[in-house]
Protein backbone atom coordinates (compact mmCIF):
# COMPACT_ATOMS: atom_id res chain seq x y z
CA UNK A 1 0.00 0.00 0.00
CA UNK A 2 1.43 3.37 -1.09
CA UNK A 3 1.48 6.33 1.28
CA UNK A 4 -1.17 8.26 -0.67
CA UNK A 5 -3.44 5.19 -0.45
CA UNK A 6 -2.94 5.05 3.30
CA UNK A 7 -3.81 8.74 3.64
CA UNK A 8 -6.97 8.35 1.54
CA UNK A 9 -8.02 5.26 3.50
CA UNK A 10 -7.55 7.01 6.84
CA UNK A 11 -9.53 10.02 5.59
CA UNK A 12 -12.35 7.65 4.64
CA UNK A 13 -12.14 6.03 8.08
CA UNK A 14 -12.45 9.44 9.74
CA UNK A 15 -15.65 10.16 7.80
CA UNK A 16 -17.11 6.75 8.56
CA UNK A 17 -16.32 7.04 12.28
CA UNK A 18 -18.07 10.42 12.45
CA UNK A 19 -21.09 8.94 10.66
CA UNK A 20 -21.15 6.07 13.16
CA UNK A 21 -20.94 8.49 16.10
CA UNK A 22 -23.88 10.46 14.72
CA UNK A 23 -25.92 7.34 14.04
CA UNK A 24 -25.27 5.99 17.54
CA UNK A 25 -26.08 9.28 19.33
CA UNK A 26 -23.55 8.75 22.11
CA UNK A 27 -25.16 11.45 24.27
CA UNK A 28 -28.44 9.53 24.21
CA UNK A 29 -26.62 6.28 25.06
CA UNK A 30 -24.84 7.89 28.01
CA UNK A 31 -28.09 9.42 29.27
CA UNK A 32 -29.88 6.08 29.05
CA UNK A 33 -27.05 4.31 30.88
CA UNK A 34 -27.38 6.87 33.68
CA UNK A 35 -31.12 6.16 33.85
CA UNK A 36 -30.60 2.40 34.01
CA UNK A 37 -27.99 2.50 36.78
CA UNK A 38 -30.35 3.48 39.66
CA UNK A 39 -33.08 1.17 38.30
CA UNK A 40 -30.77 -1.86 38.53
CA UNK A 41 -29.46 -0.73 41.92
CA UNK A 42 -32.98 -0.92 43.37
CA UNK A 43 -33.25 -3.91 45.78
CA UNK A 44 -36.59 -4.86 44.16
CA UNK A 45 -35.16 -4.88 40.63
CA UNK A 46 -35.37 -8.67 40.20
CA UNK A 47 -38.91 -8.98 41.57
CA UNK A 48 -40.17 -8.69 38.00
CA UNK A 49 -37.81 -11.12 36.30
CA UNK A 50 -39.10 -10.48 32.76
CA UNK A 51 -38.70 -6.72 33.03
CA UNK A 52 -35.31 -7.14 34.73
CA UNK A 53 -34.16 -9.36 31.86
CA UNK A 54 -35.19 -6.77 29.26
CA UNK A 55 -33.39 -3.95 31.07
CA UNK A 56 -30.27 -6.09 31.56
CA UNK A 57 -30.22 -6.91 27.84
CA UNK A 58 -30.60 -3.23 26.99
CA UNK A 59 -27.71 -2.38 29.32
CA UNK A 60 -25.48 -4.99 27.68
CA UNK A 61 -26.35 -3.80 24.17
CA UNK A 62 -25.74 -0.12 24.94
CA UNK A 63 -22.50 -0.86 26.80
CA UNK A 64 -21.23 -3.04 23.95
CA UNK A 65 -21.96 -0.33 21.35
CA UNK A 66 -20.21 2.31 23.44
CA UNK A 67 -17.18 0.07 23.97
CA UNK A 68 -16.98 -0.81 20.27
CA UNK A 69 -17.03 2.79 19.00
CA UNK A 70 -14.45 3.73 21.67
CA UNK A 71 -12.22 0.86 20.53
CA UNK A 72 -12.54 1.98 16.89
CA UNK A 73 -11.72 5.58 17.82
CA UNK A 74 -8.63 4.47 19.76
CA UNK A 75 -7.43 2.21 16.95
CA UNK A 76 -7.86 5.06 14.46
CA UNK A 77 -5.69 7.31 16.65
CA UNK A 78 -3.09 4.53 16.84
CA UNK A 79 -3.07 4.29 13.04
CA UNK A 80 -2.46 8.04 12.75
CA UNK A 81 0.43 7.71 15.18
CA UNK A 82 1.97 4.89 13.16
CA UNK A 83 1.58 6.95 9.98
CA UNK A 84 3.74 9.72 11.46
CA UNK A 85 6.49 7.31 12.50
CA UNK A 86 6.41 4.61 9.83
CA UNK A 87 8.44 4.55 6.63
CA UNK A 88 7.54 2.54 3.55
CA UNK A 89 9.32 -0.80 3.29
CA UNK A 90 10.03 -1.04 7.02
CA UNK A 91 8.60 -3.24 9.75
CA UNK A 92 6.69 -0.28 11.18
CA UNK A 93 4.98 0.18 7.79
CA UNK A 94 3.87 -3.46 7.88
CA UNK A 95 2.40 -2.82 11.33
CA UNK A 96 0.54 0.22 9.97
CA UNK A 97 -0.94 -1.80 7.09
CA UNK A 98 -2.03 -4.53 9.51
CA UNK A 99 -3.62 -1.88 11.73
CA UNK A 100 -5.53 -0.47 8.74
CA UNK A 101 -6.77 -3.92 7.68
CA UNK A 102 -7.96 -4.63 11.21
CA UNK A 103 -9.67 -1.24 11.48
CA UNK A 104 -11.38 -1.71 8.10
CA UNK A 105 -12.89 -4.99 9.29
CA UNK A 106 -14.05 -3.50 12.61
CA UNK A 107 -15.69 -0.50 10.95
CA UNK A 108 -17.47 -2.63 8.32
CA UNK A 109 -18.84 -5.02 10.94
CA UNK A 110 -19.94 -2.19 13.23
CA UNK A 111 -21.63 -0.33 10.36
CA UNK A 112 -23.95 -3.31 9.92
CA UNK A 113 -24.59 -3.57 13.66
CA UNK A 114 -25.52 0.11 13.81
CA UNK A 115 -27.92 -0.39 10.89
CA UNK A 116 -29.71 -3.05 12.95
CA UNK A 117 -31.50 -0.44 15.02
CA UNK A 118 -35.12 -1.45 14.47
CA UNK A 119 -37.40 -2.03 17.44
CA UNK A 120 -37.27 -5.82 17.05
CA UNK A 121 -33.96 -6.26 15.21
CA UNK A 122 -32.27 -7.80 18.27
CA UNK A 123 -35.00 -10.46 18.61
CA UNK A 124 -34.93 -14.09 17.58
CA UNK A 125 -36.52 -14.85 14.20
CA UNK A 126 -39.38 -17.09 13.11
CA UNK A 127 -38.67 -18.16 9.52
CA UNK A 128 -41.13 -20.04 7.31
CA UNK A 129 -40.61 -21.54 3.86
CA UNK A 130 -43.40 -22.52 1.46
CA UNK A 131 -42.87 -23.82 -2.10
CA UNK A 132 -44.88 -22.31 -4.94
CA UNK A 133 -46.20 -24.05 -8.03
CA UNK A 134 -43.91 -26.68 -9.48
CA UNK A 135 -44.47 -29.85 -7.47
CA UNK A 136 -41.42 -31.90 -6.55
CA UNK A 137 -39.00 -29.41 -8.10
CA UNK A 138 -40.29 -26.54 -5.92
CA UNK A 139 -40.35 -28.74 -2.82
CA UNK A 140 -36.75 -29.76 -3.44
CA UNK A 141 -35.84 -26.07 -3.77
CA UNK A 142 -37.58 -25.46 -0.44
CA UNK A 143 -35.37 -28.11 1.18
CA UNK A 144 -32.25 -26.55 -0.34
CA UNK A 145 -33.16 -23.12 1.06
CA UNK A 146 -33.85 -24.65 4.47
CA UNK A 147 -30.34 -26.07 4.47
CA UNK A 148 -28.93 -22.68 3.39
CA UNK A 149 -30.53 -20.91 6.35
CA UNK A 150 -29.44 -23.64 8.76
CA UNK A 151 -25.85 -23.24 7.51
CA UNK A 152 -26.07 -19.44 7.81
CA UNK A 153 -27.32 -19.78 11.37
CA UNK A 154 -24.42 -22.09 12.16
CA UNK A 155 -21.88 -19.55 10.91
CA UNK A 156 -23.51 -16.87 13.08
CA UNK A 157 -23.58 -19.07 16.17
CA UNK A 158 -27.39 -19.07 16.15
CA UNK A 159 -29.53 -21.93 17.43
CA UNK A 160 -32.05 -23.50 15.04
CA UNK A 161 -35.21 -25.31 16.15
CA UNK A 162 -37.71 -26.92 13.78
CA UNK A 163 -41.18 -25.92 14.97
CA UNK A 164 -43.15 -27.38 12.08
CA UNK A 165 -42.04 -29.66 9.25
CA UNK A 166 -43.96 -31.30 6.42
CA UNK A 167 -41.92 -33.40 4.00
CA UNK A 168 -42.56 -33.60 0.27
CA UNK A 169 -43.97 -36.83 -1.15
CA UNK A 170 -40.94 -37.59 -3.35
CA UNK A 171 -38.31 -35.10 -2.19
CA UNK A 172 -37.81 -31.81 -0.43
CA UNK A 173 -40.13 -29.96 1.90
CA UNK A 174 -43.81 -28.95 1.64
CA UNK A 175 -43.49 -26.41 4.45
CA UNK A 176 -41.21 -25.71 7.39
CA UNK A 177 -41.13 -23.27 10.30
CA UNK A 178 -37.83 -22.55 12.05
CA UNK A 179 -37.03 -20.64 15.21
CA UNK A 180 -33.59 -19.06 14.77
CA UNK A 181 -32.25 -17.78 18.09
CA UNK A 182 -29.34 -15.42 18.64
CA UNK A 183 -28.39 -11.73 18.81
CA UNK A 184 -29.95 -9.75 15.93
CA UNK A 185 -31.31 -12.89 14.25
CA UNK A 186 -34.41 -11.04 13.05
CA UNK A 187 -32.43 -7.95 12.05
CA UNK A 188 -30.25 -10.08 9.80
CA UNK A 189 -32.94 -12.34 8.40
CA UNK A 190 -35.68 -9.77 7.74
CA UNK A 191 -33.99 -9.09 4.39
CA UNK A 192 -34.80 -12.68 3.33
CA UNK A 193 -38.53 -12.10 3.41
CA UNK A 194 -39.88 -12.55 -0.10
CA UNK A 195 -39.90 -14.95 -3.04
CA UNK A 196 -36.73 -16.81 -4.00
CA UNK A 197 -36.52 -18.03 -7.62
CA UNK A 198 -34.48 -21.00 -8.82
CA UNK A 199 -33.49 -21.71 -12.43
CA UNK A 200 -31.80 -25.07 -13.11
CA UNK A 201 -31.93 -28.28 -15.11
CA UNK A 202 -34.22 -30.37 -12.95
CA UNK A 203 -32.82 -33.67 -11.64
CA UNK A 204 -36.44 -34.89 -11.63
CA UNK A 205 -36.93 -34.33 -15.38
CA UNK A 206 -35.79 -37.28 -17.50
CA UNK A 207 -35.60 -34.94 -20.51
CA UNK A 208 -33.12 -32.67 -18.66
CA UNK A 209 -35.10 -29.53 -19.31
CA UNK A 210 -34.56 -26.26 -17.53
CA UNK A 211 -37.14 -25.48 -14.83
CA UNK A 212 -38.04 -22.38 -12.82
CA UNK A 213 -39.22 -22.80 -9.22
CA UNK A 214 -40.34 -20.45 -6.47
CA UNK A 215 -40.25 -20.56 -2.67
CA UNK A 216 -41.78 -17.96 -0.38
CA UNK A 217 -39.79 -17.02 2.72
CA UNK A 218 -41.64 -15.34 5.58
CA UNK A 219 -39.75 -13.86 8.55
CA UNK A 220 -41.15 -12.37 11.76
CA UNK A 221 -39.54 -11.30 15.05
CA UNK A 222 -40.13 -13.71 17.91
CA UNK A 223 -42.07 -11.88 20.61
CA UNK A 224 -41.35 -12.74 24.24
CA UNK A 225 -43.93 -13.37 26.95
CA UNK A 226 -43.83 -9.74 28.09
CA UNK A 227 -45.33 -8.60 24.78
CA UNK A 228 -48.43 -6.44 25.05
CA UNK A 229 -50.08 -8.07 22.03
CA UNK A 230 -53.60 -9.08 23.05
CA UNK A 231 -55.47 -11.95 21.43
CA UNK A 232 -59.21 -12.41 21.94
CA UNK A 233 -60.42 -15.99 22.25
CA UNK A 234 -63.26 -15.27 19.81
CA UNK A 235 -60.72 -14.23 17.16
CA UNK A 236 -58.88 -17.57 17.21
CA UNK A 237 -59.92 -20.94 15.80
CA UNK A 238 -57.91 -23.97 16.94
CA UNK A 239 -57.73 -27.26 15.04
CA UNK A 240 -55.79 -30.34 16.15
CA UNK A 241 -54.33 -33.17 14.08
CA UNK A 242 -51.78 -35.97 14.27
CA UNK A 243 -48.20 -34.79 14.03
CA UNK A 244 -45.90 -36.33 11.45
CA UNK A 245 -42.15 -36.42 11.05
CA UNK A 246 -39.77 -36.37 8.10
CA UNK A 247 -40.90 -38.69 5.34
CA UNK A 248 -44.47 -38.65 6.61
CA UNK A 249 -43.82 -41.09 9.46
CA UNK A 250 -46.15 -40.70 12.42
CA UNK A 251 -44.53 -39.21 15.49
CA UNK A 252 -47.42 -40.17 17.74
CA UNK A 253 -51.02 -41.30 17.43
CA UNK A 254 -52.53 -38.50 19.53
CA UNK A 255 -53.82 -35.25 18.10
CA UNK A 256 -50.98 -33.18 19.53
CA UNK A 257 -50.31 -30.97 16.50
CA UNK A 258 -52.04 -27.59 16.59
CA UNK A 259 -53.26 -25.20 13.90
CA UNK A 260 -54.30 -21.71 14.99
CA UNK A 261 -56.19 -19.40 12.65
CA UNK A 262 -56.49 -15.70 13.48
CA UNK A 263 -59.91 -14.99 11.98
CA UNK A 264 -59.62 -11.18 11.53
CA UNK A 265 -56.36 -11.41 9.54
CA UNK A 266 -56.46 -14.95 8.17
CA UNK A 267 -52.99 -15.68 9.62
CA UNK A 268 -52.44 -19.42 10.16
CA UNK A 269 -49.84 -21.06 12.42
CA UNK A 270 -49.08 -24.81 12.47
CA UNK A 271 -46.96 -26.34 15.25
CA UNK A 272 -46.21 -30.03 15.83
CA UNK A 273 -42.69 -30.26 17.23
CA UNK A 274 -43.79 -30.97 20.83
CA UNK A 275 -45.50 -34.18 21.92
CA UNK A 276 -47.87 -32.23 24.14
CA UNK A 277 -50.85 -30.43 22.59
CA UNK A 278 -50.64 -27.82 25.37
CA UNK A 279 -47.01 -27.00 24.57
CA UNK A 280 -47.74 -26.86 20.85
CA UNK A 281 -50.60 -24.46 21.50
CA UNK A 282 -48.37 -22.23 23.67
CA UNK A 283 -45.71 -22.15 20.94
CA UNK A 284 -48.33 -21.45 18.26
CA UNK A 285 -49.79 -18.57 20.28
CA UNK A 286 -46.34 -17.02 20.63
CA UNK A 287 -45.67 -17.29 16.90
CA UNK A 288 -49.12 -15.88 16.12
CA UNK A 289 -48.23 -12.83 18.21
CA UNK A 290 -44.96 -12.55 16.28
CA UNK A 291 -46.81 -12.61 12.96
CA UNK A 292 -49.25 -9.95 14.14
CA UNK A 293 -46.32 -7.74 15.16
CA UNK A 294 -44.77 -8.31 11.72
CA UNK A 295 -48.06 -7.34 10.07
CA UNK A 296 -48.20 -4.17 12.17
CA UNK A 297 -44.63 -3.30 11.17
CA UNK A 298 -45.51 -3.75 7.50
CA UNK A 299 -48.55 -1.50 7.76
CA UNK A 300 -46.53 1.26 9.42
CA UNK A 301 -43.78 0.98 6.84
CA UNK A 302 -46.27 0.92 3.96
CA UNK A 303 -47.65 4.26 5.12
CA UNK A 304 -44.13 5.65 4.94
CA UNK A 305 -43.60 3.98 1.54
CA UNK A 306 -40.65 2.11 3.01
CA UNK A 307 -41.88 -1.42 3.43
CA UNK A 308 -38.83 -3.51 4.33
CA UNK A 309 -38.51 -6.99 2.90
CA UNK A 310 -41.80 -6.72 0.99
CA UNK A 311 -43.30 -10.11 0.22
CA UNK A 312 -45.17 -10.58 -3.05
CA UNK A 313 -47.37 -13.33 -4.43
CA UNK A 314 -45.50 -16.45 -5.49
CA UNK A 315 -45.09 -16.20 -9.24
CA UNK A 316 -43.29 -14.65 -12.18
CA UNK A 317 -41.82 -11.19 -11.67
CA UNK A 318 -42.40 -11.13 -7.91
CA UNK A 319 -39.08 -12.55 -6.73
CA UNK A 320 -36.58 -10.67 -4.54
CA UNK A 321 -33.67 -12.91 -5.53
CA UNK A 322 -32.80 -15.29 -8.36
CA UNK A 323 -30.52 -18.32 -8.11
CA UNK A 324 -29.42 -19.47 -11.56
CA UNK A 325 -27.67 -22.85 -11.68
CA UNK A 326 -27.79 -23.31 -15.49
CA UNK A 327 -26.85 -22.22 -18.15
CA UNK A 328 -24.54 -20.04 -16.01
CA UNK A 329 -24.10 -19.65 -12.25
CA UNK A 330 -25.27 -16.48 -10.56
CA UNK A 331 -27.21 -15.37 -7.49
CA UNK A 332 -28.66 -11.87 -7.84
CA UNK A 333 -30.75 -9.77 -5.47
CA UNK A 334 -33.19 -7.70 -7.53
CA UNK A 335 -33.64 -5.05 -4.82
CA UNK A 336 -29.98 -4.10 -4.51
CA UNK A 337 -28.43 -5.62 -7.68
CA UNK A 338 -25.87 -7.33 -5.44
CA UNK A 339 -24.74 -10.53 -7.14
CA UNK A 340 -22.38 -13.45 -6.56
CA UNK A 341 -21.03 -15.99 -9.04
CA UNK A 342 -19.99 -18.59 -6.46
CA UNK A 343 -23.39 -20.19 -6.08
CA UNK A 344 -22.14 -23.11 -3.96
CA UNK A 345 -20.84 -20.71 -1.32
CA UNK A 346 -24.25 -19.04 -1.14
CA UNK A 347 -26.09 -22.35 -0.86
CA UNK A 348 -23.70 -23.25 1.96
CA UNK A 349 -24.97 -20.25 3.94
CA UNK A 350 -22.71 -17.39 2.86
CA UNK A 351 -25.45 -14.76 2.49
CA UNK A 352 -23.92 -11.95 4.57
CA UNK A 353 -23.15 -9.96 1.42
CA UNK A 354 -26.82 -9.96 0.38
CA UNK A 355 -27.97 -9.05 3.89
CA UNK A 356 -25.46 -6.22 4.26
CA UNK A 357 -26.28 -4.78 0.83
CA UNK A 358 -29.98 -4.79 1.70
CA UNK A 359 -29.47 -3.11 5.10
CA UNK A 360 -27.29 -0.39 3.57
CA UNK A 361 -29.74 0.23 0.73
CA UNK A 362 -32.61 0.73 3.20
CA UNK A 363 -30.50 3.03 5.37
CA UNK A 364 -29.68 5.35 2.47
CA UNK A 365 -33.17 5.51 0.92
Swiss-Prot record:
Methylated by PrmC. Methylation increases the termination efficiency of RF2. Its main location: cytoplasm. The modification N5-methylglutamine is found at residue 249. GO terms for molecular function: translation release factor activity, codon specific. GO terms for cellular component: cytoplasm. It comes from the Bacteria. The keyword Isomerase does not apply. InterPro entries: PCRF (IPR005139), Pep_chain_release_fac_I (IPR000352), Pep_chain_release_fac_I_sf (IPR045853), PrfB (IPR004374). Keywords: Cytoplasm, Methylation, Protein biosynthesis. It is found in: Cytoplasm. NCBIfam families: prfB (TIGR00020). Belongs to the prokaryotic/mitochondrial release factor family. Peptide chain release factor 2 directs the termination of translation in response to the peptide chain termination codons UGA and UAA. This is Peptide chain release factor 2. It comes from Acholeplasma laidlawii (strain PG-8A). The gene is prfB.
Amino acid sequence: MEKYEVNKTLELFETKIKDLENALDLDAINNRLKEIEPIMANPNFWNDSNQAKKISQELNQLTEKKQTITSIQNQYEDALMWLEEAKEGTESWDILEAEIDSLQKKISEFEIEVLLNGEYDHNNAILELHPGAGGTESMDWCGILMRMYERFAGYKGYKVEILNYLAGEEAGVKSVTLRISGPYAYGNLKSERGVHRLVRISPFDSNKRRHTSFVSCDVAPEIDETSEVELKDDDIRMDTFQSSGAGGQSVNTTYSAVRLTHIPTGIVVNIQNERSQIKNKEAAMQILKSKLIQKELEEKQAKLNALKGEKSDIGWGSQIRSYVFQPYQMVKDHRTNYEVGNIQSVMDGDIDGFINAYLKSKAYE
